[in-house]
Amino acid sequence: MTHSARSKQAVYFAYGTLLDIDGMKKYCPSAEPLGVMSLKGYRMGFALCGADPAVGGCTLVEDAGNTMYGVLYSLPEKELADLDAASGVDKGLWATIKITLTNDMGQKVPANTLTIPDPAGPYRPPETYTNPILAGARAWPLPEGYIKQLLEIIRKA
């Protein structure tokens, strides 16, 4: 058995810029998509990472009546740690949290994702940030209504 075959795997739910597989592969070159998943009770939002007005991005926003969508990736635990480091988890900019997703068969799937732990705002992301979100969303079979919701979230940011 090779070293890579023995490496521990993790799963990561991408709902923002990392929906774009090229963006995901930049940080996690071994990441493999497992499919579209949904997360009930949340929507995607944008926020500043604490008090720094220069740093902001996607975050989870509790929304009891909403279901959001994204892509679940399988990746080595080492690459998930690398993603955390690149995201500034150690500085408190983002936090890795455990969530429970639902697949297209209705089965519950545990996963990790990133969110901003102490969101501040407002944050208006530049097009260089939102374009990969939309490109990624359109590359997967996400519900058309959800893509419209993303467009509206971006427009209102």
Residue positions per predicted region:
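Glycine-aromatic micro-motifs
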Residues: 2-157
